Regions:
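N-terminal pre-domains immediately preceding structured catalytic cores
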Residues: 2-172, 180-278
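A conserved hydrophobic position in a structured secondary element of the catalytic/binding core
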Residues: 177
Length: 278
């Protein structure tokens, strides 16, 4: 009897292990990880505790000085859902350096893009933010709109509005980073805009787009879309300058960026090899 029970246990555990290697199993692992982080961060938020990894928000000027930059330099924002992180990069010596990483208290939905109004899904993709997209009087303390839907989203019939980065720890499709963190982010982005940066790029990813992370999720419904995102991610990783992002025939296309193009809006443009232009 004991041998039979042991055999049954081995079969059950083996079957579970095999399931976790499937795309559905990987999705389950990701959902468990996301929900555990959400529960932890929301409990800390309600208790008035800082979230793990929060920068020293009381000494931003000293941190800027230590980084060798001043308030008002151009900025670039990256968001990673799975890791619950928002990064601020600042321009220094002809490229961008990471200045701070802020924990995202809450984002809603699952890994994957936003599809339609009301799906409570946080966007993924390439966006830009100008001064008109900032709201200093938001119900969520301060906020800026990502500009969803962009041209890519529109080409795929995706709908939605008021998709923000904001304070607090509540979300119906936004990225909530707490009031103290959004105050610092606000100072950095408004400082850059006030000093002449026309807009700043915000690139939102499901996770850090490494080869290993993509392999783990091979077979996902979104692996083709994520492969497009990875191309833009890799260009930045190589140069630490945001790439030029365009939309061609419903797909993202990229070109290596320069400091002069780092603030470019996402436009509808096909490269010559696609259009046949000389």
């Amino acid at each position: 009897m004991r041998q039979l029970l042991a055999l049954i246990l081995i079969v059950v555990l083996g079957g579970a292990g095999i399931y976790l290697l499937t795309p559905e199993g990987r999705q389950l692992i990701d959902r468990v990880r996301i929900n555990m982080t959400r529960a932890d961060y929301m409990a800390r938020f309600r208790a008035g505790e800082p979230l793990p990894g929060t920068p020293d928000l009381e000494h931003i000027d000293a941190r800027l000085a230590a980084a060798g930059v001043e308030m008002g330099v151009p900025v670039y924002v990256r968001i990673f859902k799975l890791e619950h992180e928002l990064e601020i990069w600042v321009e220094k010596d002809g490229r961008f350096v990471r200045f701070a990483t802020y924990p995202i208290c809450l984002w809603s939905g699952r890994l994957g893009p936003k599809l339609q109004e009301g799906d409570r899904q946080a966007p993924e993709g390439f966006y830009t933010v100008d001064a008109e997209q900032l709201n200093p009087n938001s119900r969520m303390h301060r906020s800026f709109s990502l500009g969803f839907p962009n041209l890519y989203d529109q080409a795929h019939g995706r709908t939605g509005s008021f998709l923000m980065v904001h304070g607090g720890c509540a979300s119906v499709g936004c990225y909530a980073v707490t009031d103290p963190a959004v105050d610092e982010i606000w100072r950095l982005v408004t400082g850059a805009l006030d000093k002449g940066q026309p807009r700043f790029p915000v690139h939102a990813f499901p996770f850090r787009m490494t080869d290993a992370n993509l392999r783990l999720r091979r077979g996902s419904h979104w692996d083709g879309f994520w492969a497009e995102l990875k191309t833009g991610y890799d260009l930045f990783e190589q140069s630490h300058i945001p790439p030029v992002v365009s939309v061609c025939n419903g797909r993202y296309v990229f070109a290596p960026g320069t400091i002069a193009t780092a603030n470019s809006a996402v436009e509808a443009r096909c490269p010559p090899e696609v259009t046949g232009n000389p």
